[in-house]
Each structure stands twice: as structure tokens, then as C-alpha cells.
């Protein structure tokens, strides 16, 4: 029974690690953009962002003051027995402990009263997503603290099949332009295509939080990624929306089969502080990563 191994201390730890340690692929993304940025203001802003990463890590400080909405993506491999309710309670306890023991700013409030319990938890929060893999005897838990700047700029369009792929491309470009600097670019632009309305939005967030260098498993989605990536960094939005070549690290696409009468597309963005952390449990023990 794996539930005894998944304790709140581990889930507290990946929340804190996500807030303090930027994944290696994002650091490499910064180097790549810094090497190609030609706009003086954009170059200066990228330099400041890179220095911020170093200062945060050297001093074990947070990368950003926004501790986000906590999202836990749980992937259950073959041969793994998990007490789901116990795992949920461990996640809630881990979030609460991270917030109160570190301490962290709790960014989670009731939607109408705006009451903050100072736990980073509330009704249906942390967000917990469950998926399954063919990895033998492995339980993986990814933690993503999703900041409000990137989350606020989210869109869903229920397009028509007759609109084709062109409406998807136009919609994504319009969203990037409308977001401007509000998403703290350079961003990862996540695009969900297909499914139902809720699945499409979910896929856009999956895309936005994928590691740089990864590619959509659907060949058609991968082609769409290439086409959109070629356009987005020519829009001139630039770092923090103040102009430049570096509007996005990448455009990521995730697709799903959809109804014959539907053509949904959703956009969700991840800010330049594209934070995530992972805990992987196997019979050999626990390991942390990204």
C-alpha cells in the first residue's frame, strides 16, 4: 500500500522546491532567448530575470512572490496501490504545512467572501489531477504553483468545424497580443485543441506546463506547434510586454478527439518563472526532480 509512503512532508517539500528552484529546461530557454534578443530593452529585462533566478537560488528565496494556486498532477503506474483519499489528505496537509511552516503567502481565498484561511487550501483546492501510466511500480507527483498573471489570461473558443485550422492559429495569435505584458513574458503558450470545453481548457494547461523541448505526441499537433512558434516571436510583444524578440519560450499544443460538430480551442499561458517540481516514488525510494 503506497499511501503510507506518500507523506505530507514530501508533498510539502515539492511545493517549496517548485517555488524556489527553476527547472533546467527553463534556464536553458533563458540562455537561448538571451543569445538571440536584439531589442535593447528586451535584452536588459532578460538579464534582470536571469539575475533574479540566481539570487533566488543562491539565497534559497522564492523565485516570485506569487505562490499561486497549488496544482498536483498525480500519475499512477502499473502495480501501484494507492489509497486515493489518504493521498488527497496528504496533499492538503502538505500544502498547509508548506504555507504555515515555511512560511509562505497564502494566495487562495473564497471566491465570494475573499476570506483567506492562510493554508493555500480551500474548496477543490489544491487542484488534484489523476492520470495513469505504464511505468511499473512508479508513482509520480508533479507540483505546479500557477500564478495569477498567467492564469488570468486564459481563453476558450468554441469554433465551428468549418472554421478549420486557420481559426485556431488566428485565435492563439490574438490571445498572445491581447495578453501583452500581463502574463510576464517570455511565456510558454499552451494550446488545447479538441475534446469538450472542460477537456480543451485542461489540455491547454497541460501544454503550458510541459517541459521545454518536449513535443506534442500527435503529429498534427506537433506541426501546429511549429507553425505557431514561428509566428509568435515575430509579434514584438517581448519580455514583460515592453518590446523585443522574446515573446515566448515556445508554443505547446495538446490535442484530443472531439465531436463532429465541434472545433474547440483554448489558450493558457505560463509566465517566465515556469515553476514545477516532481516527487517520484518507486520501491527503491523517493527522488525529487522536475
Task: Describe the function of each predicted region.
Residues 68-134:
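A generic, well-ordered mixed alpha/beta core segment in the N-terminal half of proteins
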Residues 10-13, 28-29, 211, 215-290:
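Domain-length cofactor-binding catalytic modules of enzymes
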Residues 37-61, 117-122:
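Translation machinery proteins
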Residues 137-214:
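Conserved mixed alpha/beta catalytic, RNA-binding, or beta-rich assembly cores of soluble enzyme
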Residues 1-8:
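Short, small-residue-biased leader/transition segments that mark boundaries at the very start
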Residues 74-76, 84-86, 154-156, 198-205, ...:
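Short acidic, glycine/serine/threonine-rich loops at helix termini
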Residues 59-75, 182-200, 260-268:
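Conserved phosphate/anionic-ligand binding catalytic regions in large, soluble enzymes, centered on
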Residues 22-30, 41-46, 60, 100-114, ...:
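Flexible, glycine/charged-enriched surface loops at secondary-structure junctions
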Amino acid at each position: 500500500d503506497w499511501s503510507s509512503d506518500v507523506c505530507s512532508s514530501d508533498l510539502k517539500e515539492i511545493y517549496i522546491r517548485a517555488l524556489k528552484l527553476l527547472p533546467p529546461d527553463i534556464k536553458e530557454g533563458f540562455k537561448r532567448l538571451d543569445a538571440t534578443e536584439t531589442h535593447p530593452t528586451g535584452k536588459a529585462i532578460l538579464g534582470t530575470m536571469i539575475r533574479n533566478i540566481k539570487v533566488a537560488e543562491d539565497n534559497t528565496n522564492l523565485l516570485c512572490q506569487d505562490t499561486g494556486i497549488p496544482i498536483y498532477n498525480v500519475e499512477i503506474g502499473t502495480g501501484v496501490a494507492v489509497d486515493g483519499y489518504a493521498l488527497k489528505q496528504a496533499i492538503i496537509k502538505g500544502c498547509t504545512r508548506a504555507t504555515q511552516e515555511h512560511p509562505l503567502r497564502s494566495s487562495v481565498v473564497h471566491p465570494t467572501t475573499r476570506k483567506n484561511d492562510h493554508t493555500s487550501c480551500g474548496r477543490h483546492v489544491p487542484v488534484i489531477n489523476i492520470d495513469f501510466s505504464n511505468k511499473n511500480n512508479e508513482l509520480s507527483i508533479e507540483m505546479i504553483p500557477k500564478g495569477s498573471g498567467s492564469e488570468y489570461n486564459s481563453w476558450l473558443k468554441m469554433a465551428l468545424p468549418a472554421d478549420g485550422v486557420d481559426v485556431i492559429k488566428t485565435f492563439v495569435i490574438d490571445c498572445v497580443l491581447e495578453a501583452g505584458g500581463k502574463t510576464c513574458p517570455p511565456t510558454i503558450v499552451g494550446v488545447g485543441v479538441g475534446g469538450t470545453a472542460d477537456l480543451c481548457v485542461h489540455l491547454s494547461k497541460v501544454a503550458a506546463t510541459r517541459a521545454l523541448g518536449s513535443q506534442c505526441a500527435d503529429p498534427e499537433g506537433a506541426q501546429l506547434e511549429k507553425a505557431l512558434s514561428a509566428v509568435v516571436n515575430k509579434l514584438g510583444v517581448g519580455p514583460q510586454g515592453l518590446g523585443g524578440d522574446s515573446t515566448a519560450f515556445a508554443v505547446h499544443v495538446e490535442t484530443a478527439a472531439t465531436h463532429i460538430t465541434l472545433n474547440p480551442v483554448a489558450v493558457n499561458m505560463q509566465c517566465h518563472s515556469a515553476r514545477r517540481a516532481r516527487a517520484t516514488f518507486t520501491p527503491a525510494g523517493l527522488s525529487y526532480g522536475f
